[in-house]
From Swiss-Prot:
Organism classification: Bacteria, Pseudomonadati, Pseudomonadota, Betaproteobacteria, Burkholderiales
SUPFAM superfamilies listed in its UniProt record: Cytidine deaminase-like, Methylglyoxal synthase-like
Organism: Janthinobacterium sp. (strain Marseille)
Protein name from the UniProt record: Bifunctional purine biosynthesis protein PurH
Substrates-to-products reaction catalysed: (6R)-10-formyltetrahydrofolate + 5-amino-1-(5-phospho-beta-D-ribosyl)imidazole-4-carboxamide = 5-formamido-1-(5-phospho-D-ribosyl)imidazole-4-carboxamide + (6S)-5,6,7,8-tetrahydrofolate; IMP + H2O = 5-formamido-1-(5-phospho-D-ribosyl)imidazole-4-carboxamide
Gene name as annotated: purH
Keywords noted in UniProt: Hydrolase, Multifunctional enzyme, Purine biosynthesis, Transferase
């Protein structure tokens, strides 16, 4: 049965209710600084750590709990006679529970213009020491670093005569070690990102030592292939709009490939302001469209490549209503994603329990970095988050684009960013007409896109084409023009740009350059 708890928290969420409940169970509460003041002001009996140890807080609060009477009471093993004897000899009572969360270092350094002095003053020393001491001796000490665990601990204490199960203690200890590792990792990342000048005015996005922290969501039946094992991890606090914030409403457990494809679909669809639908297969869009409604967007997207859409991932950037749900339900789909689902849509898919429905709040989440593992190393880059605007486009052909061509070109360019390189995308009237992806030759991607359109019964006459990188020769342009394209958008930047521009003028084709490349591997 616990007799004494030490509570010292930066995040005061729920601490009054928690401390009051402990006090009601007869637990003596030790505390420091602001936490002690808050408890006392609210009528909760509390002993200041300085009074408990007989040693005052000092150095502007830098030294509060770094004392043998605190750490001895935490670290002593109750089943070791030598430890118990040492406590008795030095008059050190045991501390049976430690409730600590840390100075907000990560929030501090995330602020614009954060100074090194601000960062230093938000590095917690005593807190991590107490947490680690408690977690090390978790057999005898209940340790809590997260306010969301208060209710479970109180429930067990009430139900088990002031005791908490070993399983809960061990789970809380694991959480503490993960928390302190993340905390120290954030400090390391910050310090190793600073320049060596005395003002530390420069701060790199790529620290000399990189620490990453992710929490496991689930283990999966297998990875990309059945002989591979896999698990899904997420950041501690994903941004609003990130895939990791999904809520699964129904369906089978998500697979490794489901999550990879769902991310590709969601990242693409949320870039559109209009009601949009994206159909993904093997991380490539096989149909993208905008429309006046989710139903119209889906119907147009499906036309691009209905064969490849079979068993795909479908994402919407609007609530999926009953009309769209009825249409989608006719198609075999693995995962369906939307910001929300109407009650009618939920009813329709309730009869198709294998279909995974994911709700994700819309938002502008962008990963701080993209990662790619290589043998013995890690490639790190900023995400490809650039969206070209009209003012940045350069018309390089003699022929000027019409408003409709500009609209089609911008749509095609937006889609091409999400197609594996080499990427060629034919579009018209807010829908993809043919997608050529992942070929070693840009000409082959153009030919495949043309074949796809032909197979779907779509005419490419008058279409707009986007290429994710420049045309190194005129031959790629000749292929898309021969297929029916009358306007083309690409980054430019080739030593043969003029040759390609001349070819466009020769064939009366509109050509725009973006100055931005969108390789995707």
């Amino acid at each position: 049965m616990i007799k004494q708890a030490l509570i010292s928290v930066s995040d005061k969420t729920g601490v009054l209710e928690f401390a009051r409940a402990l006090s009601g169970m007869g637990v003596n509460i030790l505390s420091t600084g602001g936490t002690a003041k808050l408890l006392a002001e609210n009528g909760i009996s509390v002993t200041e750590v300085a009074d408990y140890t007989g040693f005052p807080e000092m150095l502007d609060g830098r030294v509060k709990t770094l004392h043998p009477k605190v750490h001895g009471g935490i670290l002593a093993r109750r089943d070791f006679a030598e430890h118990v004897s040492a406590l008795e000899k030095h008059n050190i009572p045991t501390i049976d529970m430690v409730v600590v969360n840390l100075y907000p270092f990560q929030q501090t350094v995330a602020r614009e213009h954060c100074s090194l002095e601000d960062a230093i003053e938000n590095i917690d020393i005593g807190g991590p020491a107490m947490l680690r001491s408690s977690a090390k001796n978790h057999k005898d000490v209940i340790v809590i670093c997260d306010p969301t665990d208060y209710s479970q601990v109180l429930g067990e204490l009430s139900a088990n005569q002031g005791e908490v199960s070993y399983e809960t203690k061990f789970t809380l200890a694991k959480k503490v070690f993960a928390h302190t590792a993340q905390y120290d990792g954030a400090i390391t990342n910050y310090f190793t990102s600073l320049g060596a000048d005395k003002q530390h005015a420069t701060r790199s996005s790529y620290p000399a030592t990189l620490n990453l922290h992710f929490e496991k969501v689930q283990e999966m039946r297998y990875g990309e292939n059945p002989h591979q094992s896999a698990a899904f991890y997420r950041e501690s606090n994903p941004q609003v709009g990130a895939l990791a914030n999904y809520t699964q409403l129904q369906g089978k457990e998500l697979s490794y490939n489901n999550i990879a494809d769902a991310d590709a679909a969601w990242e693409c669809v949320k870039t559109f302001d209009e009601s949009a639908c994206v159909i993904i297969k093997h991380a490539n869009p096989c149909g993208v469209a905008v429309g006046a409604s989710p139903l119209e967007a889906y119907s147009k997207a499906l036309q691009t490549d209905p064969t490849s859409a079979f068993g795909g991932i479908i994402a919407f950037n609007r609530e999926l209503d009953g009309n769209a749900a009825e249409a989608v339900a006719k198609q075999f789909v693995e995962v369906l994603i939307a910001p929300s689902f109407s009650e009618k849509a939920k009813q329709i898919f309730a009869g198709k329990q294998n279909v995974r429905l994911l709700e994700i709040p819309l938002g502008n989440a962008v990963n701080a970095h993209d990662f790619k593992r290589v043998g013995g190393g890690l490639l790190v880059q900023s995400p490809d988050a650039k969206n070209v605007v009209l003012a940045e486009l350069k018309v390089v052909s003699k022929k000027q684009p019409t408003p409709q061509q500009l609209q089609d070109l911008m749509f095609a360019w937006r889609v091409a960013k999400f197609v594996k390189s080499n990427a060629i995308v034919f579009c018209a009237n807010g829908m993809t007409m043919g997608v050529g992806a992942g070929q070693m030759s840009r000409i082959d991607s153009a030919r495949i896109a043309s074949i796809k359109a032909q197979n779907a019964g779509l005419s490419l006459v008058g279409t707009a084409v986007a290429s994710d990188a420049f045309f190194p020769f005129r031959d790629g342009l000749d292929v898309v023009v021969a297929a029916g394209a009358t306007s083309v958008i690409h980054p430019g930047g080739s030593m043969r740009d003029q040759e390609v521009i001349d070819a466009a003028d020769e064939q009366g084709v509109v050509m725009l350059m973006t100055g931005t490349r969108h390789f995707r591997h």
